Amino acid sequence: MEVPADSSSCLQVKRVHSLSVLKNKVSCFFLTIYWANALSRDSARVAGLDSEVRVRRDCELREGGMPSVLGTLDESMAEDAFGLGVDGYSEGASMFTADVTRLGRPLRRRAAGGDAGRAGEGAGAAGGLGRGGEARGGAAEAAETAEALDFQPPPSKLFAGRVERPISNDSIVTEAAETLSTHFDMSASTSSSSRGSSVVIEKSQAHEAAEESATGAPCKKYLFASSRDRLQLSLGGMEASLSSLHIPAAGADAGGAVHSVASFSRTAPALVTTSKALTPSQRYRLRREQNKVALQNSIKQREVFYEEQERGSRGRSASLKGVLGLPHAVDELSEDISDYLGWDVPVVSPTTGPFLAAAERSEKHTDRRPGVARSRSSTYVDHTMPPSPIPGIQKTSDLEFFTETSKKLSCVYLDTSKETSKSKLYERSQSAELLPIEFKAASDEGMEDLKLVSSGKMAVCSNSRPSWLPPKDTEERARHERQIRQTIDIASLSQIDRTKERAERDTRDEKNRKRLAQLVERGLVRKSTLTELKKICWETSLPPDSRFQIYTTLLQSDTAKLIEEQYIDNFDQVDALFRSMQFPNAKLAEIQAMLACTPCTANVAPADDLIYLLQLKAISRQGLLLGDPLLVHHLLQVGCYSTREIWVLVNILQLTCFNETTKDKYDRRIISSRGTVSTALSADKTFAQEFNSKCLNFTTWWHLMARLDHAVFMWCLDIIVAENSQPFKSNPIIRDKLNGKDWDYYRDLHVVVNYRIICALTLTVLLSYHFGFNNLYDLSFVDPAFQIIGPEQGDLGDVHATFIKKWHHNYKKF
């Protein structure tokens, strides 16, 4: 730009230019604040104004020099914004123009005074002070008039870092130029989106600006709208004048140049043709605008759905304009929907919701607008009904619309929660089985529910450590669990072995019983038969129904039965004697005291047969002997013998197996220092206090037998009888030789005195079952319920078999 020769005029131009720029900034600042408040306060009122009123007010404001923002601005608004009337504002109107866009679009400012000043400078540079000088003069006068106003400029520090370069009319195209088209036909509104920005059309000849500044009556046209539909409503019938509008170039050199308003599309920005080269800042802004437009186009190409909705909306809007005669209502509806779409809010209206079924109208609805025919099948839309988010046009409210969905979701969530809770409780119930016994006892007492025990507690709890001790560390826990598993494996193998042995024992018992029946039929008088019988007795107890026959055969021969005939009192005679006499009370008291000291009869009422047989035994020739209560009691427990048979068996057993000779030998040999018992007990010094005649005698042996249960007692009795048998075939009983002989003579010839078998039994108890008592003498004072081999130790079959095996092993030592 060429600087004028006159320095005073140059300084004046610079000052006017600076003041113009400053005033433009101050005015735009206050105008921005005003419209930020005015848009939020008066948006509903402005949107409801009639199109004719808006056009009339726009014309009035343009005549007064007040720019039209969003289509309307009255005098009161101007007074509120600047404290001036329309006339006062018109004085400074030539200094600036403002463009405020809708929905947060950037504010565009255009300094008309600066354009006029630059036009004047261009004219001066051309070599004259013609219309350009006049324009400078008009600008100076406008500046002086503006200085008279009460505007207080902001502090200079706000503008110290930013001095904008004046922008000429032919610089670059802004966003407002993109929405401008040379044809403002009504039918052209359906070709692009309604999201356009404000359009500013002005006459920019420099000489006309100078004339207008001198007269104070600007003739500029400011059209602010948010879409082409708003532009159509604002312009009204001015399409012809705008379509033929042309702007000549400023300056004398450019008198023949014609600048036509180019046709701008939404896809490519169009620039106003100019003969001047762009400055670097203009090229930079040009590239920035082009990039912005390209980005917008790229976004629009991806918004296929919304573009289709807009095209459908415009098509239906155009049809409704002709049918209903309500163009402004349809335009506003389409515009509002476009605003929703700009913010990606799905909305629906009766014209833009073809996918929604038409709501059934109530027959009682009588609110009909006069002059408009409505029908059930029509697409009439009440223009007062704003578009709303889906499903706003339904009869039901949003709450009712989503009630069913929310109920289903709630059911799903509740079911899922219940199933999850059940699975967690099931897992914890399963894991609770592995907790220590102390935890289970605490749970039973109500201290804590094991079903609520978490995995964290399970991690520190162990069956092998009490709960009051610190938890095990990882290594110790793993080591103990490994040892426990090994122990369990060994126990499992032992259990497998025991199960196998039980099965083998059952098979063996069945086989032995069959073999025993064959031996009884063959006769128990041979030595070979007795050997096999003894083996069977060590493995299997005798059948209860065969005991009487086997006992009498083994102890007195099956043919002679001399003991029963000569050395035992006849049962019938003793019974007759008992019935014919008064039994002494002292003797009865003695019998009851004996039964009270016997463990197997101490806690139960003695049977009548037991007392009866003991009374008979008391009045017999042998008298009541040690062991009679036990023998009578267990034989009665068998349940298959009569009182006569029990009488015979008890007397035979006392005369043969437990006679005086056996008793004497047992008492001497059990405590012999060179005997088998002494040799076995001497290895353990703890038996030194028991190895005496007080603890080891025939009486204490019966104390031992009283602590055995019925099954093992009878099995032991079977073995003792078998070991006291003899082969009567090789040593037969000759009745003639024994006639008139006493019992001692008969015992020496035909009775086997086997004390070793009962000594082996005592040794077995002392070595393997010495639990719960100090010695055999104190055993009689122990609780009557105590048993040496009791059911609490496991399966009786296994326990009894183990006891018999150990007894047999110790018997072999004798």
Swiss-Prot record:
Keywords: Cell wall biogenesis/degradation, Golgi apparatus, Protein transport, Transport. Coiled coil: none annotated. Residues 114-136 have a biased composition (Gly residues). GO terms for cellular component: Golgi apparatus. Residues 137-149 have a biased composition (Low complexity). Residues 360-370, 472-482 have a biased composition (Basic and acidic residues). It comes from the Eukaryota. Residues 109-160, 360-395, 463-482 are annotated as: Disordered. It is found in: Golgi apparatus. InterPro entries: Sbe2/Sbe22_C, SBE2/SBE22_M, SBE2/SBE22_N. The keyword Transferase does not apply. GO terms for biological process: fungal-type cell wall organization; protein transport. Belongs to the SBE2 family. With SBE22, is involved in cell wall integrity and polarity processes like bud growth. This is Protein SBE2. It comes from Eremothecium gossypii (strain ATCC 10895 / CBS 109.51 / FGSC 9923 / NRRL Y-1056). The gene is SBE2.
